[in-house]
Amino acid sequence: MRTYTPLIYNIYNVHIWVFTESQGQIGQMSPRGKMETAVSQGQHKQLKDGHQHKGRKLSEEIASLLRLKECRRLNPASYYTPRRTSQSQSLSGSTFKEYNEYVNEKDSSRAQRQNAAAVLSKLAHDFWENDCVIDEDIFEDSSDEEQS
């Protein structure tokens, strides 16, 4: 059984695990979808010495880590539970139903303008049908007229 030392490094979402045993290297994905590489103690010492003595930049260190043969990218889909389509459909169907109907109503402002134009043309037609007669009935509901 392999045991791990508590040395875990996180460099740009690449975790490096250091084995206490020198045999067997693995690469695996963490639960958050980050790539992890497990290296032996000898490789850890080489990486540590190379970083301290050569003074390499962090980007060079990351590039060398990614070139290691033990480092491989795994599919993160196996670590996440798939979302059911019925769940997403129910959310869109109930929560945002009124908003979606309002937003997706085709040409709502154009329809309102057309309705207003139709009402205005009907009123104009009624006015001209009555031979332009204005009687006192139109002033019954007006509050500006004096009541006698």
From Swiss-Prot:
- Quote the subcellular location field of this record: Cytoplasmic granule; Cytoplasm
What are the record keywords, sorted? Answer: Cytoplasm, Phosphoprotein, Protein kinase inhibitor
Q: Which residues carry this modification: Phosphoserine?
A: 59, 86
Induction comment from the UniProt entry of this chain:
Regulated by phosphate, probably through its PHO4-binding elements in the promoter.
Q: Name one GO molecular function term.
A: protein kinase inhibitor activity
**Entry GO CC:** cytoplasm
Q: Does the keyword ATP-binding apply?
A: no
Protein purpose: Putative cyclin-dependent kinase (CDK) inhibitor necessary and sufficient for PHO pathway-dependent down-regulation of low-affinity phosphate transport.
Write the protein's name. Putative cyclin-dependent kinase inhibitor SPL2
Please report the organism this UniProt entry assigns to the protein. Answer: Saccharomyces cerevisiae (strain YJM789)
Give the gene name.
Answer: SPL2
